[in-house]
Amino acid sequence: MRRFCLLAVVLLQLPLLHAQAVQFSGAKALEYARQFVACGPRFNGSAGLLCAQNYLKKQFAHDNLQEDTFVASTPVGPQELTNFIVRFPGKKDGIIVLATHYETNYPLRNTSFVGANDGAATTGLLLEIANHLRGRTLDGYSVWLVFFDGEEAVQSWSNSDSLYGSRHLAAKWQVDGTLKKIKGFLLADMIGDRDLDITRVTTATPAIEDLVYEAAKKTGNASHFFKDEAAEEDDHLPFVQRGVPSADVIDVDYGPHDAEHPDGWHHTPEDTLDKLSAKSLTISGEVFLESIRLLNAH
């Protein structure tokens, strides 16, 4: 009986493994990021943000794309924000969510900050992941890609001035019952750095962080994961707080730390395309696709 069950599990997984056997292209993800950065700064109310939103609409024009527009109360007054949700249906009853934020820092609106690693790289990552999902009904859970608006603080980071898009969507999905269907929420942030070193996030769900590390080991990428840990406040938090098993896949150490850049290139005009690496995006993409497979096997 045990042998039969094992064989059945293997046979059930074969279509999923075969369907995702095509190699993830970090080069394609980087090209998507380049096109996204070409929109310019993407802060609320900017032409660059409108360009970025139109870019996402164009990329997902033939997919099941939903715009989630709402008005957020911010320290500078009401602001209209828009999340994007792209649904790829699966045969199993449940949802895996892969997410990123796509806008840039509002307080840096008078600088040349374009968030190449902070928003654009992860947008490129999800766009390339979409190429591995579309065109068929997935054999496992449905996979939803979410692009959050309003992750950044409008004035100064606090519980009420940050994570606007994720707080809104988590609350909305709690009311309509979507949260109960989520088997895993995987957030991507700052993962295009040439010197990739993903941090273990202690504010995430330990079991899902463990699953991501297992995916890194299975894909031969463990050397880039979890050498250190940090208690990050990020778009996973509103979901963790509502009981959704979640991971935050983030490289918090970005660029040299010196007197001029105490936080490295994070939130500086130096966060530019030349700091990104197709190899790092390939590593991240492989781990995300393997994490989907592992979640489906659970």
What is the predicted function of each stretch?
Residues 34-42, 57, 61-66, 128-138, ...:
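Sec-exported extracytoplasmic/periplasmic mature domains
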Residues 5-15:
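Bacterial N-terminal signal peptides
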Residues 113-214, 223, 228-236:
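Acidic/histidine-rich catalytic neighborhood of metal-dependent amide-processing enzymes
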Residues 35, 85, 95-99, 144-147, ...:
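Structural recognition of the beta-strand scaffold that forms the well-ordered cores
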